Amino acid sequence: MQCDVQGIPMYYETAGEGRPFLMLHGGYIDHRHMAHDLEPIFANHPGWKRFYPDLPGHGRTPAPDWLTNQDQVLEIVLGFIDRVIVGSRVVVAGVSRGGYLARGVLAKRSESVDGVLLVTPARHGNAGRVEDNPHNVVLVRDDSLLSNMSPVEKALLPGYVVQNQKAVQGIRRNLLALELTDQAFQKRIMSDYEFSFDVDQLPSSFERPALIVAGRQDALFGYLESWKMMAQFPRATFAVLDRAGHYLPTEQSDLLHTLASEWLQRVESYPAEVDHTA
Protein backbone atom coordinates (compact mmCIF):
# COMPACT_ATOMS: atom_id res chain seq x y z
CA MET A 1 0.00 0.00 0.00
CA GLN A 2 0.99 3.62 -0.43
CA CYS A 3 -0.04 6.97 0.98
CA ASP A 4 1.18 10.43 0.00
CA VAL A 5 2.94 12.40 2.74
CA GLN A 6 4.30 15.79 1.68
CA GLY A 7 4.59 14.53 -1.87
CA ILE A 8 6.44 11.35 -0.84
CA PRO A 9 4.72 8.06 -1.75
CA MET A 10 5.15 6.17 1.52
CA TYR A 11 5.07 2.40 1.10
CA TYR A 12 3.65 0.43 4.00
CA GLU A 13 2.12 -2.90 4.90
CA THR A 14 -0.36 -3.83 7.59
CA ALA A 15 -1.15 -6.94 9.60
CA GLY A 16 -4.09 -7.75 11.84
CA GLU A 17 -7.04 -5.62 12.90
CA GLY A 18 -7.72 -3.54 15.97
CA ARG A 19 -5.87 -0.79 17.84
CA PRO A 20 -3.15 0.96 15.80
CA PHE A 21 0.47 -0.08 16.37
CA LEU A 22 3.19 1.79 14.45
CA MET A 23 6.47 -0.01 13.71
CA LEU A 24 9.55 2.10 12.89
CA HIS A 25 12.49 0.19 11.42
CA GLY A 26 16.21 0.80 11.76
CA GLY A 27 18.51 2.63 9.39
CA TYR A 28 19.63 1.26 6.01
CA ILE A 29 17.07 -1.57 6.02
CA ASP A 30 13.26 -1.56 5.74
CA HIS A 31 9.98 -2.61 7.30
CA ARG A 32 10.61 -6.31 6.75
CA HIS A 33 13.01 -6.63 9.67
CA MET A 34 10.39 -5.17 12.03
CA ALA A 35 7.79 -7.64 10.81
CA HIS A 36 10.19 -10.55 11.25
CA ASP A 37 11.41 -9.38 14.66
CA LEU A 38 8.10 -8.45 16.31
CA GLU A 39 5.21 -10.22 14.58
CA PRO A 40 5.62 -13.33 16.80
CA ILE A 41 4.42 -11.41 19.87
CA PHE A 42 0.98 -10.95 18.32
CA ALA A 43 0.23 -14.67 18.26
CA ASN A 44 -0.98 -14.22 21.85
CA HIS A 45 -2.11 -10.62 21.49
CA PRO A 46 -4.89 -10.27 18.90
CA GLY A 47 -6.70 -7.00 18.50
CA TRP A 48 -3.83 -4.93 17.10
CA LYS A 49 -3.46 -3.50 13.61
CA ARG A 50 0.24 -3.22 12.84
CA PHE A 51 1.49 -0.54 10.45
CA TYR A 52 4.89 -1.23 8.89
CA PRO A 53 6.06 1.75 6.78
CA ASP A 54 9.25 1.97 4.78
CA LEU A 55 10.80 5.22 6.00
CA PRO A 56 12.05 7.70 3.36
CA GLY A 57 15.18 6.49 1.58
CA HIS A 58 14.51 2.89 2.62
CA GLY A 59 12.79 0.00 0.91
CA ARG A 60 10.14 1.20 -1.53
CA THR A 61 9.83 4.75 -0.18
CA PRO A 62 11.94 7.36 -2.01
CA ALA A 63 13.70 10.29 -0.37
CA PRO A 64 13.52 13.57 -2.32
CA ASP A 65 16.58 15.81 -2.42
CA TRP A 66 14.98 18.34 -0.07
CA LEU A 67 14.87 15.76 2.72
CA THR A 68 18.12 16.49 4.55
CA ASN A 69 17.63 16.28 8.32
CA GLN A 70 15.96 14.29 11.06
CA ASP A 71 13.37 16.96 11.90
CA GLN A 72 12.02 16.57 8.37
CA VAL A 73 11.96 12.78 8.65
CA LEU A 74 10.03 13.07 11.92
CA GLU A 75 7.50 15.35 10.21
CA ILE A 76 7.06 12.66 7.56
CA VAL A 77 6.41 10.06 10.29
CA LEU A 78 3.89 12.35 11.99
CA GLY A 79 2.26 12.99 8.62
CA PHE A 80 2.02 9.25 8.04
CA ILE A 81 0.24 8.90 11.39
CA ASP A 82 -2.18 11.69 10.44
CA ARG A 83 -2.92 10.18 7.03
CA VAL A 84 -3.16 6.49 7.91
CA ILE A 85 -3.93 6.31 11.64
CA VAL A 86 -6.49 9.09 11.51
CA GLY A 87 -7.64 10.44 14.86
CA SER A 88 -6.68 7.31 16.79
CA ARG A 89 -4.40 6.76 19.71
CA VAL A 90 -1.35 4.70 18.80
CA VAL A 91 1.32 2.43 20.24
CA VAL A 92 4.82 2.92 18.82
CA ALA A 93 7.79 0.57 18.54
CA GLY A 94 11.19 1.52 17.17
CA VAL A 95 14.47 -0.32 16.69
CA SER A 96 17.79 1.55 16.50
CA ARG A 97 17.19 4.63 14.31
CA GLY A 98 13.48 3.84 14.46
CA GLY A 99 13.76 4.07 18.24
CA TYR A 100 15.16 7.57 17.91
CA LEU A 101 12.23 8.54 15.69
CA ALA A 102 9.81 6.94 18.16
CA ARG A 103 11.24 9.20 20.86
CA GLY A 104 10.62 12.11 18.52
CA VAL A 105 6.98 11.03 18.17
CA LEU A 106 6.71 11.01 21.96
CA ALA A 107 8.23 14.48 22.18
CA LYS A 108 5.62 15.83 19.76
CA ARG A 109 2.56 13.63 20.38
CA SER A 110 2.92 11.93 23.78
CA GLU A 111 -0.70 12.71 24.66
CA SER A 112 -1.90 10.37 21.88
CA VAL A 113 0.55 7.48 22.49
CA ASP A 114 -0.59 4.53 24.62
CA GLY A 115 2.74 2.74 24.90
CA VAL A 116 6.27 2.68 23.53
CA LEU A 117 8.84 -0.05 22.85
CA LEU A 118 12.44 1.02 22.23
CA VAL A 119 15.05 -1.56 21.19
CA THR A 120 18.75 -0.59 21.15
CA PRO A 121 17.83 3.11 21.02
CA ALA A 122 20.15 6.09 21.38
CA ARG A 123 21.25 9.19 19.57
CA HIS A 124 23.16 8.22 16.46
CA GLY A 125 25.20 11.36 16.96
CA ASN A 126 26.67 9.53 19.95
CA ALA A 127 27.46 6.34 18.07
CA GLY A 128 30.94 5.11 18.80
CA ARG A 129 31.64 7.97 21.21
CA VAL A 130 29.67 6.99 24.28
CA GLU A 131 31.97 6.18 27.20
CA ASP A 132 30.17 3.00 28.19
CA ASN A 133 30.39 1.47 24.72
CA PRO A 134 32.13 -1.90 24.95
CA HIS A 135 34.68 -2.87 22.37
CA ASN A 136 33.53 -5.24 19.66
CA VAL A 137 33.40 -8.68 21.22
CA VAL A 138 32.37 -12.07 19.90
CA LEU A 139 30.90 -14.42 22.50
CA VAL A 140 29.83 -17.21 20.14
CA ARG A 141 31.65 -18.03 16.90
CA ASP A 142 31.05 -20.83 14.43
CA ASP A 143 33.81 -20.65 11.83
CA SER A 144 32.26 -23.51 9.88
CA LEU A 145 29.65 -21.03 8.61
CA LEU A 146 32.24 -19.01 6.69
CA SER A 147 32.64 -21.52 3.88
CA ASN A 148 29.02 -20.95 2.81
CA MET A 149 29.02 -17.16 3.10
CA SER A 150 29.60 -14.61 0.36
CA PRO A 151 32.23 -11.87 0.79
CA VAL A 152 29.48 -9.32 1.47
CA GLU A 153 27.92 -11.55 4.13
CA LYS A 154 31.31 -12.10 5.76
CA ALA A 155 31.87 -8.34 5.88
CA LEU A 156 28.68 -7.89 7.91
CA LEU A 157 29.28 -10.75 10.34
CA PRO A 158 31.69 -8.88 12.70
CA GLY A 159 28.78 -6.71 13.87
CA TYR A 160 27.28 -9.73 15.61
CA VAL A 161 28.17 -10.75 19.16
CA VAL A 162 26.70 -14.20 18.53
CA GLN A 163 27.98 -15.45 15.18
CA ASN A 164 25.83 -18.49 14.53
CA GLN A 165 23.37 -19.65 11.89
CA LYS A 166 20.73 -17.18 13.14
CA ALA A 167 23.18 -14.35 12.51
CA VAL A 168 23.78 -15.55 8.95
CA GLN A 169 20.04 -15.78 8.35
CA GLY A 170 19.62 -12.24 9.71
CA ILE A 171 22.33 -10.93 7.41
CA ARG A 172 20.74 -12.58 4.39
CA ARG A 173 17.30 -11.18 5.24
CA ASN A 174 18.67 -7.66 5.53
CA LEU A 175 20.84 -7.78 2.40
CA LEU A 176 17.79 -7.38 0.18
CA ALA A 177 16.83 -4.22 2.06
CA LEU A 178 20.39 -2.89 2.10
CA GLU A 179 20.43 -3.06 -1.70
CA LEU A 180 17.35 -0.79 -1.82
CA THR A 181 18.59 1.92 0.54
CA ASP A 182 19.21 5.38 -0.92
CA GLN A 183 22.90 5.94 -0.15
CA ALA A 184 22.79 9.63 -1.10
CA PHE A 185 19.98 10.15 1.41
CA GLN A 186 21.90 8.24 4.08
CA LYS A 187 24.86 10.58 3.64
CA ARG A 188 22.61 13.62 3.96
CA ILE A 189 20.81 12.41 7.05
CA MET A 190 23.95 11.20 8.83
CA SER A 191 25.56 14.61 8.34
CA ASP A 192 22.66 16.30 10.18
CA TYR A 193 21.32 13.48 12.28
CA GLU A 194 20.02 14.77 15.60
CA PHE A 195 16.75 16.60 16.09
CA SER A 196 16.90 20.37 16.54
CA PHE A 197 15.19 19.86 19.93
CA ASP A 198 16.39 17.88 22.95
CA VAL A 199 14.74 14.49 22.58
CA ASP A 200 15.76 13.66 26.16
CA GLN A 201 13.46 16.37 27.51
CA LEU A 202 9.84 15.35 27.07
CA PRO A 203 7.20 18.00 27.86
CA SER A 204 6.20 15.75 30.78
CA SER A 205 6.92 12.23 31.98
CA PHE A 206 5.43 9.49 29.83
CA GLU A 207 3.06 7.80 32.28
CA ARG A 208 2.04 4.82 30.15
CA PRO A 209 3.73 1.42 29.81
CA ALA A 210 7.14 1.43 28.16
CA LEU A 211 9.87 -1.11 27.47
CA ILE A 212 13.49 -0.21 26.76
CA VAL A 213 15.80 -3.06 25.71
CA ALA A 214 19.55 -2.64 25.23
CA GLY A 215 22.39 -4.99 24.37
CA ARG A 216 25.10 -5.46 27.00
CA GLN A 217 27.69 -5.86 24.24
CA ASP A 218 26.31 -3.15 21.92
CA ALA A 219 29.53 -1.62 20.59
CA LEU A 220 27.62 1.07 18.70
CA PHE A 221 25.57 2.63 21.51
CA GLY A 222 26.33 0.79 24.72
CA TYR A 223 23.50 0.68 27.26
CA LEU A 224 24.01 3.50 29.77
CA GLU A 225 22.70 6.11 27.34
CA SER A 226 19.46 4.14 27.23
CA TRP A 227 19.36 3.95 31.03
CA LYS A 228 19.45 7.74 31.19
CA MET A 229 16.01 7.82 29.56
CA MET A 230 14.38 6.09 32.51
CA ALA A 231 13.62 9.28 34.44
CA GLN A 232 11.10 10.15 31.73
CA PHE A 233 9.37 6.75 31.84
CA PRO A 234 7.95 5.96 35.31
CA ARG A 235 6.08 2.94 33.90
CA ALA A 236 9.05 1.48 32.01
CA THR A 237 10.80 -1.86 32.21
CA PHE A 238 14.50 -1.53 31.38
CA ALA A 239 16.37 -4.66 30.28
CA VAL A 240 20.04 -5.09 29.37
CA LEU A 241 20.57 -8.41 27.63
CA ASP A 242 23.79 -10.41 27.71
CA ARG A 243 24.87 -12.13 24.49
CA ALA A 244 23.41 -9.20 22.58
CA GLY A 245 24.93 -6.35 20.64
CA HIS A 246 23.24 -3.91 18.29
CA TYR A 247 21.61 -6.86 16.48
CA LEU A 248 19.79 -7.84 19.65
CA PRO A 249 16.50 -8.77 17.90
CA THR A 250 18.36 -11.57 16.10
CA GLU A 251 20.73 -12.58 18.89
CA GLN A 252 18.14 -12.65 21.69
CA SER A 253 14.88 -13.02 19.79
CA ASP A 254 13.13 -15.32 22.27
CA LEU A 255 13.89 -13.10 25.25
CA LEU A 256 12.86 -9.99 23.33
CA HIS A 257 9.54 -11.62 22.45
CA THR A 258 8.94 -12.52 26.11
CA LEU A 259 9.69 -8.99 27.29
CA ALA A 260 7.64 -7.39 24.52
CA SER A 261 4.70 -9.69 25.19
CA GLU A 262 4.69 -8.74 28.89
CA TRP A 263 4.92 -5.05 27.98
CA LEU A 264 2.04 -5.37 25.52
CA GLN A 265 -0.03 -7.03 28.23
CA ARG A 266 0.59 -3.96 30.40
CA VAL A 267 -0.47 -1.69 27.54
CA GLU A 268 -3.67 -3.68 27.09
CA SER A 269 -4.53 -3.59 30.79
CA TYR A 270 -3.51 0.03 31.40
CA PRO A 271 -6.99 1.63 31.31
CA ALA A 272 -8.26 -0.84 33.91
CA GLU A 273 -5.26 -0.19 36.17
CA VAL A 274 -5.75 3.56 36.37
CA ASP A 275 -8.26 5.12 38.73
CA HIS A 276 -9.59 7.92 36.54
CA THR A 277 -11.73 9.25 39.40
CA ALA A 278 -8.75 10.01 41.66
PLM regions and their residue ranges:
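Catalytic histidine neighborhood in serine/cysteine hydrolases
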Residues: A231-Y247
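Conserved alpha/beta-hydrolase catalytic His-Asp/Glu region
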Residues: A127-R129, S147-S204
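Flexible "cap/lid" loop of the alpha/beta hydrolase fold
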Residues: R103, A107, V113-L146
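Active-site loop/oxyanion-hole signature of alpha/beta-hydrolase fold enzymes
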Residues: K49-A93, T258
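Conserved HGGG/HGGXW glycine-rich cap/lid loop of the alpha/beta-hydrolase fold
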Residues: I8-P62
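Catalytic histidine-centered segment of alpha/beta-hydrolase-like enzymes
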Residues: A244-S253, H257
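Gly/Ala-rich beta-loop-alpha elbow adjacent to hydrolase catalytic centers
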Residues: G94, G98, A102
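Conserved serine/cysteine hydrolase catalytic core
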Residues: K187-A231, V240
